């Protein structure tokens, strides 16, 4: 079983981790890190270390990133469907090997468009994006980093404009509810979001730079494979 070094965003995140109730594994599309081997490793780790776990994959908004990199809408949708299908296949196979049920375990952002809890948190985030220039700029910065990273992974590049960044930022905004308070959305009591890198926007949120708060029953952890020193902000 693969061992991971775990870093905590806050002391509260560490306390939630120590109770080992539930973890959400964040899996990014078009990110070389999330190959079949790594996806299997983190599922094994979650199964061994927590009472239960869920998996969060990108939603329809991930096509925005590809469109910003020059793909047509139809081509972007095709690539997203293929990538998500690939990731789901790896996840389902490993979940079964862990003797866990697949039902209600693998989620995408876009699965919750009609979820009242998701809608409420998302609306708060969008309102903040539209009224707080500092928050908006922080989201746009993350969008730029995501475009640069994914541009390398799909072997393409294009001039990035302010309009492009704002369109790409919809991906960031769609993910944020799961960082702030995933519990009512996925029906858990307390949980941690686990990812392979620090999240600068999340750090800014817990440092009270914006009028957004992480719920006390929600945490964020960074997983680093033992002996793997490549981790960086994305």
Curated annotation (Swiss-Prot):
Top-rank taxon, per record: Bacteria
Record InterPro entries: CDPS, CDPS_sf
GO molecular function: aminoacyltransferase activity
Catalytic activity, as annotated: 2 L-leucyl-tRNA(Leu) = cyclo(L-leucyl-L-leucyl) + 2 tRNA(Leu) + 2 H(+)
Main function: It uses activated amino acids in the form of aminoacyl-tRNAs (aa-tRNAs) as substrates to catalyze the ATP-independent formation of cyclodipeptides which are intermediates in diketopiperazine (DKP) biosynthetic pathways. Catalyzes the formation of cyclo(L-Leu-L-Leu) (cLL) from L-leucyl-tRNA(Leu). Can incorporate various nonpolar residues, such as L-phenylalanine, L-leucine and L-methionine, into cyclodipeptides.
Protein family according to the UniProt entry: Belongs to the CDPS family.
Name the record gives this protein: Cyclo(L-leucyl-L-leucyl) synthase
């Amino acid at each position: 079983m693969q061992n991971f070094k775990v870093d905590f965003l806050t002391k509260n995140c560490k306390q939630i981790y120590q109770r080992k109730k539930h973890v959400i594994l964040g899996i990014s599309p078009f990110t070389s890190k999330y190959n079949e081997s790594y996806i299997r490793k983190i599922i094994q780790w979650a199964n061994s270390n927590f009472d239960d776990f869920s998996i969060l994959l990108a939603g329809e908004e991930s096509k925005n990133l590809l469109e910003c990199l020059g793909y047509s809408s139809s081509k972007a949708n095709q690539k997203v469907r293929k990538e998500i299908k690939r990731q789901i296949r790896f996840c389902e196979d490993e979940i079964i090997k862990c003797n866990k049920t697949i039902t209600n375990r693998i989620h995408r952002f876009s699965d919750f468009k009609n979820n009242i809890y998701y809608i409420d948190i998302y609306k708060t985030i969008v309102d903040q994006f539209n009224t707080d220039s500092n928050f908006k700029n922080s989201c746009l910065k993350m969008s730029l980093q995501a475009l640069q990273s994914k541009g390398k992974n799909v072997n393409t590049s294009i001039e990035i404009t302010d309009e492009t960044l704002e369109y790409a930022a919809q991906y960031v905004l769609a993910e944020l509810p799961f960082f702030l308070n995933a519990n009512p959305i996925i029906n858990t009591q307390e949980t941690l979001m686990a990812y392979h890198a620090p999240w600068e926007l999340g750090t800014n949120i817990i440092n009270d730079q914006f009028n957004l708060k992480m719920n006390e029953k929600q945490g964020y952890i960074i997983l680093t494979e033992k002996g793997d020193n490549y981790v960086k902000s994305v």
